[in-house]
């Protein structure tokens, strides 16, 4: 769902930063 998408985006951003 949307929550999973947000979690994935957060992980990607955390990896970049």
UniProtKB/Swiss-Prot annotation:
Signal peptide bounds: none
Supply the alphabetized keyword list.
Amidation, Amphibian defense peptide, Secreted
In which tissues does this protein get expressed? Expressed by the skin glands.
Listed disulfide bonds for this chain? Answer: none
Keyword Repeat in record: no
- Main localization is secreted
**The keyword Transcription appears for this protein:** no
GO terms, biological process: defense response
User: Which Gene Ontology CC terms are recorded?
Assistant: extracellular region
Query: Where does it live in the cell?
Result: Secreted
Residues carrying Valine amide? 17
- Annotated TM spans: none
Name the UniProt record assigns to this protein: Caerulein precursor fragment-related peptide R3
| Provenance organism | Xenopus ruwenzoriensis
């Amino acid at each position: 769902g949307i929550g999973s998408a947000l979690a994935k985006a957060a992980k990607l951003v955390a990896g970049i930063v």
